[in-house]
UniProtKB/Swiss-Prot annotation:
This is Tol-Pal system protein TolB. The gene is tolB. Residues 1-31 form the signal peptide. It comes from the Bacteria. One of its GO terms (biological process) is protein import. Belongs to the TolB family. GO terms for cellular component: periplasmic space. The Tol-Pal system is composed of five core proteins: the inner membrane proteins TolA, TolQ and TolR, the periplasmic protein TolB and the outer membrane protein Pal. They form a network linking the inner and outer membranes and the peptidoglycan layer. It holds the Pfam family TolB_N. It comes from Orientia tsutsugamushi (strain Boryong). The lineage of its organism: Bacteria, Pseudomonadati, Pseudomonadota, Alphaproteobacteria, Rickettsiales. The keyword RNA-binding does not apply. Part of the Tol-Pal system, which plays a role in outer membrane invagination during cell division and is important for maintaining outer membrane integrity. InterPro entries: 6-blade_b-propeller_TolB-like, PD40, Tol-Pal_TolB, TolB_N. The keyword Cell cycle applies.
Length: 453
């Protein structure tokens, strides 16, 4: 009997000792773990952050419906980023909503949430609402930040995108691209011709509309730095002209008309100048700067080669462009006066459509080699060149405001049963997280706006 008791006590002591060791190790891990709110996230990471977006508290039916719509947009934004993994509301344990209480963090930990979003919506007058939201770090049981936005009812989608941007920024330390727009060329077929119209939409495909009527051939639309104008090339009677469309007033006017073929217009970062390419002589193309304040036109490139596709650096002091001056089509960099020209890329292959990243560390490009097209990025010193998108005809890269995401178009060959399809895709500059951006019709020549206020 004594021996049995001794054995039992020994087992109990072993169990107690094991529990003590587990608790000690757990506390040690917790003491040396950095909270989520201070982790720097990169899009190349495969592990997504589980996030619970609670329904925002609301009193009236109108506020309740708005709450559901806003939470749905926030969840969709964060989900497509592939950084976050929104948790289904069916799994939520805590039922209390709003921003006035401290969450029951154990309940959120039970469903493996690392980040919790609580909020409330209040109607403040006949047209306006106020939304307040709090970002909680469930792991550390601490508030990361809280903010409020006042908005008219028609801007609820934009407000939801703003909240998603704030969540992305405060958790990852990087800018989000959710409250942005995309302009592109939409192409459809009529009975006897292709109809090309400039279209604009939110980054998630919502609020889609056309800003040209399809009567004239249009190419290469770009946003102004303040997002209030679209610059593009329109062909009237087969003559190309650079036009500018005011998104606020709807006014549309010719900005510049040269002899020969004019294409590839680009705004300067301050919006006061534009660059265009013009070919008035056979096999010779030059880059011109147009001062929008004075109307003065300045030729930046010289010689008897093709110089085209200019792209300003973020500070406007340098310009990336394409030239065949070395015998093959390569990307060069010059200063904003046309001097100090340096070659960036080298063979094999031809390099076109340079796009300078807003963070000033990479230039995106289209590469053509042996009939194959690809999208890539390269550092400003010519190092770290890598291909991030391929398949048939990919072209026209444009950077999102975060300097990490690139949009481009991809054409699919026609088959016996299908016509040629041209679609828009976005991809991280590391080559991760490629996704299709839905458009009603064929789409090409995309350009990403800056962040909307």
């Amino acid at each position: 009997m004594i021996n049995n008791l001794s054995v039992s006590m020994t087992k109990v002591l072993k169990i107690i000792l094991t529990i003590i060791i587990i608790l000690f190790n757990t506390l040690s891990i917790l003491a040396n773990t950095t909270t989520l709110s201070s982790i720097k996230i990169t899009k190349g990471n495969c592990t997504q952050i589980p996030i619970a977006i609670n329904f925002f508290s609301a009193k009236s039916n109108e506020e309740h419906d708005l709450s559901q719509n806003i939470v749905s947009i926030i969840s969709n934004d964060l989900n497509i980023s592939k950084i976050f993994a929104p948790i289904s509301s069916d799994l939520f344990i805590e039922t209390e909503q709003g921003v006035a209480h401290i969450p029951l963090f154990t309940a959120w930990s039970q469903i493996n949430a690392n980040i919790l979003i609580n909020g409330e919506i209040t109607k403040i007058d006949s047209t306006d609402f106020k939304v307040t939201f709090v970002i909680w770090d469930v792991f550390s049981a601490k508030e990361i930040t809280r903010k409020s936005f006042t908005f008219p009812s028609q801007l609820w989608r934009s407000t939801a995108h703003k909240i998603a941007d704030q969540i992305y920024k405060h958790v990852t330390g990087s800018k989000g691209n959710f409250n942005t727009k995309i302009v592109y060329v939409s192409e459809s077929n009529s009975s006897n011709r292709k109809i090309r119209r400039i279209a604009i939409m939110d980054q998630d495909g919502a609020n889609h509309n056309y800003i040209t009527n399809g009567k004239n051939h249009v190419i290469t639309p770009v946003f102004s730095p303040k997002n209030n104008q679209i610059l593009y090339v329109s062909y009237h009677n087969k003559i190309p002209t650079v036009r500018i469309h005011d998104l606020n007033s709807g006014n549309n006017k010719i900005l510049a008309s040269f002899n020969g073929i004019t294409f590839s217009p680009r705004f300067s970062p301050d919006g006061n100048k534009i660059l265009v390419s013009n070919s008035s002589t056979k096999n010779v193309t030059h880059i011109y700067e147009i001062n929008l304040l004075t109307g003065k036109i300045k030729q930046l490139t010289k010689g008897q080669s093709i110089n085209t596709s200019p792209s300003y650096s973020p500070d406007g002091s340098k310009i990336a462009f394409v030239s065949d001056r070395s015998g093959s089509t390569q990307i060069y960099i010059m200063n904003d006066q046309g001097g100090n020209i340096k070659r960036l890329t080298s063979q094999p292959g031809a390099y076109t459509t340079p796009a300078w990243s807003p963070t000033n560390n990479y230039i995106a490009f289209t590469k053509i080699e042996a009939g194959e097209f690809s999208i890539g990025v390269i550092k400003l010193d010519g190092s770290n060149k890598r291909i991030i998108a391929t398949k048939y005809l990919v072209e026209g890269p444009s950077w999102a405001p975060d300097g990490k995401t690139i949009i481009f178009s991809r054409a699919y060959k026609a088959t016996k049963s299908t016509s040629t399809k041209v679609k828009l895709y976005s991809v991280d500059y590391t080559g991760y997280n490629e996704r299709e951006i839905q458009t009603p019709e064929n789409a090409s020549d995309p350009n990403w706006s800056n962040e909307y206020e």
